[in-house]
């Protein structure tokens, strides 16, 4: 089964993309079937200067498990933001300090203080390079490198939705939110521009070893 292209990122466009020495291009592919609960991905680090045989339209597989495994082509406009760990990755003492600090702001949004911190302050929704995983559907789990045991870091988050749960849309991008999509895209959903769906609306995190990016990566759905 041919794998599908999912993302192509250039180091010149994405400051947080820490490419291995001698490379400046990351290509992410996946199999459009669950292995066992999400698509299995493959990472390719390359030098853009050596990529000469470019396909205008990548071939589609003869079959897919779900339509949500075929991404809609998108042109990226990366925006750099600052994130913080999910409250579940913090000490009990720091969680309590954040809870007390967030009470007034959370009340204005009619949200629980911990939910306010996670949704509005700590974790940006949508597709992203780097950052922290969100643990709203499962508890934090260790992510050691299978080769050397180093704690792995998130390389790429593939998300079902681009928008968060807060009504104020604190993570909305800079571009004009009222911009109209192309009339050719009558099925376009601004909350899901890639049309990708992970599970019932989750995220798929791809993590790599910071000591040796060539070590096998791991996948996690949250």
Locate each region found by the language model.
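Preference for intrinsically disordered or flexible, low-complexity segments
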Residues: 1-222
């Amino acid at each position: 089964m041919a794998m599908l292209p999912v993302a192509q990122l250039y180091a010149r466009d994405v400051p947080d993309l820490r490419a291995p020495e001698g490379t400046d291009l990351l290509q992410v592919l996946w199999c459009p079937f669950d292995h066992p609960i999400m698509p299995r991905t493959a990472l390719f680090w390359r030098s853009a200067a050596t990529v000469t045989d470019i396909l205008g339209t990548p071939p589609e597989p003869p079959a897919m498990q779900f339509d949500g495994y075929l991404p809609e082509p998108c042109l990226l406009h990366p925006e750099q933001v600052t994130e913080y760990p999910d409250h579940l990755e913090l000490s009990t003492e720091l969680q309590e300090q954040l809870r007390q600090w967030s009470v007034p702001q959370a009340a204005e949004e009619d949200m629980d203080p911990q939910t306010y911190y996670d949704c509005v302050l700590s974790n940006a929704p949508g597709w992203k390079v780097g950052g922290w995983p969100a643990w709203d559907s499962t508890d934090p789990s260790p992510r050691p490198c299978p080769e050397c045991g180093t704690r792995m870091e998130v390389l790429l988050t593939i998300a079902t939705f681009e928008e968060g749960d807060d009504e104020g849309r604190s993570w909305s991008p800079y571009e004009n939110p009222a911009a109209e999509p192309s009339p050719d895209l009558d099925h376009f959903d601004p909350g899901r521009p890639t049309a990708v769906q992970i599970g019932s609306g989750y995220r798929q995190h791809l993590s790599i070893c910071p000591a040796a990016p060539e070590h096998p990566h791991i996948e996690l759905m949250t």
